Curated annotation (Swiss-Prot):
It holds the Pfam family prok_STING. The keyword Protein biosynthesis does not apply. The N-terminal TIR domain mediates NAD(+) hydrolase (NADase) activity. The cyclic nucleotide binds in the C-terminal bacterial STING region. Upon binding to c-di-GMP the STING region closes around the ligand, which is bound by residues from 2 adjacent subunits. STING-STING interactions are the main drivers of filamentation; rearrangements in the STING domain allow reorganization of packing of the TIR domains, forming the NADase active site; cross-filament contacts strengthen the assembly. One of its GO terms (biological process) is defense response to virus. The lineage of its organism: Bacteria, Pseudomonadati, Pseudomonadota, Gammaproteobacteria, Pasteurellales. Its EC number is 3.2.2.5. It comes from Aggregatibacter actinomycetemcomitans (Actinobacillus actinomycetemcomitans). Coiled coil: none annotated. InterPro entries: CAP12/PCTIR_TIR_dom, Prok_STING. Residues 4-128 form the TIR domain. In the C-terminal section; belongs to the bacterial STING family. This is CD-NTase-associated protein 12. Keywords: Antiviral defense, Hydrolase, Nucleotide-binding.
Length: 317
C-alpha cells in the first residue's frame, strides 16, 4: 500500500501545490491528495456537501504524512515592522495535522521571504523561492527523503497503535515468554506442547461484528482448546491449537480487540458519516494496516518474530 500525503495550501496557491504533487509522485512511492484540487475534483478531500472540519478529520485519518505550503499571502505588522506570513487557515491545518500524525510526519514548505512564528520553529521546515523550479524541487525532495526515512510502523496517535500495544502485552508477550522459558507449553491436563508456532489471524477487512467474522473463520479450522498458566500471571488462558504432529503445535489466535478500531473511528467521526462510503472503508483499512504494522514492530522488538507469524485470512487455507 502506497503511503498517502496530504497537501494543504491557500486556494490562491493551488498552482504551487500541483507542482509539489508532481514532484512527490515521480517515483510512484506516494499517493498525494491536494485539498480543494479543482482540476481533479473527484480526488479532492473536500466536497461541497461536507463540513470543513469533518473533511479535515477524514483526511488526517486517511493520510500518513502532511505537507502544508506557506506562501506570502498576508501582510502583518510584527513589532512595528511589516512582514509577510501565510494564511491563518494554513497554520491551523499545520497544527491540526501535527496533532493527528505526529511532528515527524508533517512538514512546512515555505517561501523564502515568509515570516515564521517562533511557535512553529522545530518542525520540519523547507524554504524555497516558489517561483524557481529548481529550488522548489530541491526543497520538496528534502521533504520526500525525510518522509521515506520515517519508521514504517512507528507508534502514533491512532487507536490502532494503542490496541496493538494492549494485545501484544496481554497475549503475545506472556504466551511467548512461556514458550521460550518453559521450552513449550504445559497445559492444565499435564501435557507438554513443544515446538510451538503462534499464528495471528487478521481479517481482510473489518466489519462491525468482528466476533462473528472470526467465528466464521474458526469454523473452517479444526482446532482444540488448550489451557495453561500465563507466564507471570495468576490465571489460566485458553487458546486454540492445531497439532500438525506430536512434536509441533500451532497456536491460532483471532485478535477480536480490533473491533475497537471500528468503534473508535465511528466515535471520532460525526454521527452522520456514511459507514458504507469509500472514504470510511479506506479509513478502516488503513487503521487495520496500522494495527498489523505496529504489532509486527512490537513482535520484532521483543525477538518473537521466529515463533509468531501474522497471517491474513485469505492466506490461511
Amino acid at each position: 500500500m502506497k503511503k498517502k500525503i496530504f497537501i494543504g495550501s491557500s486556494s490562491e496557491e493551488l498552482r504551487i501545490a500541483e507542482k509539489v504533487k508532481k514532484i512527490l509522485e515521480q517515483d510512484n512511492e506516494f499517493e498525494v491528495t491536494i485539498w480543494n484540487d479543482n482540476s481533479i475534483w473527484d480526488n479532492s478531500v473536500f466536497k461541497l456537501n461536507h463540513n470543513f472540519l469533518t473533511d479535515l478529520l477524514n483526511s488526517s485519518l486517511s493520510s500518513d504524512f502532511g505537507i502544508l505550503i506557506g506562501t506570502c499571502d498576508d501582510k502583518v505588522i510584527v513589532r512595528g515592522t511589516e512582514r509577510l506570513q501565510p494564511r491563518d487557515n494554513v497554520l491551523f491545518e499545520l497544527g491540526f495535522f501535527i496533532g493527528k500524525l505526529g511532528l515527524d510526519n508533517c512538514a512546512f514548505l515555505i517561501d523564502k521571504n515568509i515570516h515564521i512564528l517562533s511557535d512553529v520553529q522545530g518542525i520540519t521546515l523547507a524554504r524555497a523561492n516558489m517561483g524557481d523550479p529548481d529550488e522548489l524541487k530541491r526543497a520538496v525532495n528534502c521533504i520526500k527523503e525525510h518522509f521515506k526515512h520515517q519508521p514504517n510502523s512507528g507508534i502514533n496517535f491512532f487507536p490502532s497503535s494503542t490496541l496493538a500495544s494492549v494485545y501484544h502485552e496481554n497475549f503475545i508477550k506472556p504466551t511467548c515468554q512461556t514458550i521460550i522459558e518453559d521450552n513449550g507449553i504445559l497445559d492444565t491436563a499435564g501435557k507438554k506442547h513443544t515446538n510451538c508456532l503462534v499464528k495471528i489471524i487478521i481479517p481482510n477487512k473489518i466489519n462491525i461484528d468482528v466476533n462473528s467474522q472470526f467465528q466464521i473463520l474458526k469454523n473452517k479450522i479444526s482446532t482444540n482448546t488448550l489451557s495453561f498458566n500465563y507466564k507471570g500471571r495468576p490465571r489460566n488462558i485458553s487458546i486454540e491449537i492445531v497439532e500438525s504432529s506430536e512434536e509441533n503445535t500451532t497456536i491460532i489466535d483471532f485478535p477480536t480487540i480490533i473491533s475497537g478500531i471500528y468503534y473508535a473511528i465511528s466515535n471520532l467521526l460525526p454521527q452522520d458519516s456514511e459507514t458504507d462510503s469509500i472514504t470510511y472503508r479506506n479509513i478502516l483499512a488503513r487503521e487495520l494496516d496500522r494495527f498489523v504494522n505496529t504489532l509486527y514492530k512490537f513482535i520484532k522488538r521483543d525477538g518473537y518474530d521466529e515463533i509468531v507469524k501474522i497471517v491474513y485470512e485469505d492466506k490461511l487455507y
